[in-house]
Swiss-Prot record:
Pfam families: SNF. Residues 147-220 are extracellular. GO terms for cellular component: cell projection; GABA-ergic synapse; plasma membrane; postsynaptic membrane; presynaptic membrane; synapse. Keywords: Cell membrane, Glycoprotein, Membrane, Neurotransmitter transport, Phosphoprotein, Symport, Transmembrane, Transmembrane helix, Transport. It is found in: Cell membrane. InterPro entries: Na/ntran_symport, Na/ntran_symport_GABA_GAT3, SNS_sf. PROSITE patterns: NA_NEUROTRAN_SYMP_1 (PS00610), NA_NEUROTRAN_SYMP_2 (PS00754), NA_NEUROTRAN_SYMP_3 (PS50267). Belongs to the sodium:neurotransmitter symporter (SNF) (TC 2.A.22) family. SLC6A11 subfamily. The modification Phosphoserine is found at S21. Brain and retina. Expressed predominantly within neurons. Expressed in the hippocampus (at protein level). GO terms for biological process: amino acid transport; monocarboxylic acid transport; neurotransmitter transport; neurotransmitter uptake; response to xenobiotic stimulus; sodium ion transmembrane transport. It comes from Rattus norvegicus (Rat). Residues 1-36 are annotated as: Disordered. This is Sodium- and chloride-dependent GABA transporter 3. The lineage of its organism: Eukaryota, Metazoa, Chordata, Craniata, Vertebrata.
């Protein structure tokens, strides 16, 4: 297109690949021609074949387990329908702005989660490292949930679910089937100390949980095999980059909706379903005065939108330059929140049925997180006719929901590494070997969470390594970097060059003021209200356990200030001169659309630069900084 002719560098990619091809394709004859063709294929970064692949990949990443097991419970816990008020506020002020920022940044720079920040503002390259550290932690522990789900699924192919009854080798004498309990016959049983078969299956059969993190115990080899299966599937979903990922998401991103629809129809037709839905949505406006309700709404937005992980930047970087990422982001954000809302009906209708069957208040059966997926819902399906069928559908839905979130995260980390060292990893099968190495290392690191004390380690990862506190910290710096240092007006020019028009000004002001202000407020609230983690609200970790948790949290957050300090220390000159140099975007970061191709004095990244005679744009001037 015209822009590419005027700006042959294409943000540095085309020129770099062309130089690599020329350098490696020397010599003559057929061998040289073959080598040149091979090098051209190796150095090609790749792109989505069509918009559908991008949309499904992003949808698969952001629509995950949190939509099913976290949002409905938070809605019920925080005032039902009243919770939607703070949720919508954060949806508009934080969710959409940061989601759009990361996607547009990836599309404009055509870079992964680290090098995109290096090109935009070298001083804030630490943002990229922070996101990838969080993602590396996430890749290790998130897939553990898939291993559990695969294990449960493998136990569904039977006439009677193993967690439906007592009498198995893993059950204790305290096991009581409550739905069959006759109080006159079981007067000698202390119901206060009794446990359900579904709880014993989870704690004694699946986890074989020890009494604390101090006692790691033996490896659960069955779960290790399930984890191996999960990593094998994940590897082959992404081993060819966008070529394989773009095809796999047609199944992994759409199948959960089919399962959710089936479970929704089944749920709302059960007795007691209406009571469950009532508890899910009945508004309690008095809860809005509780700051924790607003904090829960904000953190849920960050969790469910996969922001501050580098995933959206990586996925956006494979788009065509002129893709309308603004429209895509609005649509995907609405789809994500809509899915969470509908999932609440599917979950709470079943919980209402379970409360009805047991004759207890729904508050006693409502759960979130693993408690919902592996205790509450499995217990509910045992009360239904054809319970193995419904259990199979439920765990298949969980696996597909988690699978695409997992492999997209791994793909994003790989993209970040490959874009940092393109000449190393874009040759032969090195990219595939990199994915294999990351998968193997992550697999062995994850095995520690499949030991008898592994659940305690899993909770540390979940509460510290990829916590809302880390995401909020990164979001503050992302907004400051784009809104103030790089410049929101400059970034709006870049976006206009890509999509042909400027987005609503509200998003720009969110980047500059609203989003960082809200994130800072919630971050401070987190620190002030911090309470040490307890497993099941009972087990207290030893001091060194909390130390490990905080080290994992700081491992990502410290990347940003440490990188700023290192760059300032290594750069020569006075402090103003250092800031001047480190806040200027990369010289080859250019607009490739109509604005960038205009044969006149053009505005490139808010600075004036003259078009040279060869059609390229002169280097970025010193004016291109806000310092």
């Amino acid at each position: 297109m015209t822009a590419e002719q005027a700006l042959p560098l294409g943000n540095g990619k085309a020129a770099e690949e062309a130089r690599g091809s020329e350098a490696l394709g020397g010599g003559g004859g057929g061998a040289a021609g073959t080598r040149e063709a091979r090098d051209k294929a190796v150095h090609e970064r790749g792109h989505w074949n069509n918009k559908v692949e991008f949309v499904l990949s992003v949808a698969g990443e952001i629509i995950g387990l949190g939509n099913v097991w976290r949002f409905p419970y938070l809605c019920y816990k925080n005032g039902g329908g009243a919770f939607l008020i703070p949720y919508v506020v954060f949806f508009i002020c934080c969710g959409i702005p940061v989601f759009f920022l990361e996607t547009a940044l990836g599309q404009f720079t055509s870079e992964g989660g680290i090098t995109c920040w290096r090109r935009v503002c070298p001083l804030f390259e630490g943002i990229g490292y922070a996101t990838q550290v969080i993602e590396a932690h996430l890749n290790v522990y998130y897939i553990i949930i898939l291993a559990w789900a695969i294990f449960y699924l493998s136990n569904c192919f039977t006439t009677e679910l193993p967690w439906a009854t007592c009498g198995h080798e893993w059950n204790t004498e305290k096991c009581v089937e409550f739905q069959k309990l006759n109080f006159s016959n079981y007067s000698h049983v202390s119901l206060q100390n009794a446990t359900s078969p579904v709880m014993e299956f989870w704690e004694r059969r699946v986890l074989a949980i020890s009494d604390g993190i101090e006692h790691i115990g033996n490896l659960r080899w069955e779960l290790a095999l399930c984890l191996l299966a999960a990593w094998t599937i994940c590897y082959f979903c992404i081993w060819k980059g966008t070529k394989s990922t773009g095809k796999v998401v047609y199944v992994t991103a759409t199948f959960p909706y089919i399962m959710l629809l089936i479970l929704l129809i089944r749920g709302v037709t059960l007795p007691g379903a209406s009571e469950g839905i009532k508890f899910y949505l009945y508004p309690d406006l008095s809860r809005l005065s509780d700051p924790q309700v607003w904090v829960d709404a904000g953190t849920q937005i960050f969790f469910s939108y996969a922001i501050c992980l580098g995933c959206l930047t990586a996925l956006g970087s494979y788009n065509n330059y002129n893709n309308n990422c603004y429209r895509d982001c609005i649509m995907l954000c609405c789809l994500n929140s809509g899915t969470s809302f509908v999932a609440g009906f599917a979950i709470f209708s079943v919980l209402g049925f379970m409360a009805y069957e047991q004759g207890v208040p729904i508050a006693e059966v409502a759960e979130s997180g693993p408690g919902l997926a592996f205790i509450a819902y499995p217990k509910a399906v045992t009360m239904m006719p054809l319970s193995p069928l419904w259990a199979t559908l439920f765990f298949m839905m969980l696996i597909f929901l988690g699978l695409d979130s997992q492999f997209v995260c791994v793909e994003s980390l790989v993209t970040a590494v490959v874009d940092m060292y393109p000449k190393v990893f874009r040759r032969g099968y090195r990219r595939e070997l990199l994915i294999l190495a990351l998968s193997i290392v992550s697999y062995f690191l994850g095995l520690v969470m499949l030991t008898e004390g592994g659940m305690y380690i899993f909770q540390l990862f979940d509460s510290y390594a990829a916590s809302g506190m880390c995401l909020l910290f990164v979001a503050i710096f992302e907004c400051v970097c784009i809104g103030w240092v790089y410049g929101s007006n400059r970034f709006y020019d870049n976006i206009e060059d890509m999509i042909g028009y400027r987005p609503l000004s509200l998003i720009k002001w969110c980047w500059k003021v609203v989003t960082p202000g809200i994130c800072a407020g919630i971050f401070i609230f987190f620190l002030v209200k911090y309470k040490p983690l307890k497993y099941n609200n009972v087990y207290t970790y030893p001091a060194w356990g909390y130390g490990i948790g905080w080290l994992m949290a700081l491992s990502s957050m410290l990347c940003i200030p440490l990188w700023i300090f290192i760059k300032l220390w290594k750069t020569e000159g006075t402090l103003p001169e250092k800031l001047q140099k480190l806040t200027v975007p990369s010289a080859d970061l250019k607009m490739r659309g109509k604005l960038g191709a205009s044969p006149r004095m053009v505005t490139v990244n808010d600075c004036e630069a003259k078009v040279k005679g060869d059609g390229t744009i002169s280097a970025i001037t010193e004016k291109e900084t806000h310092f």
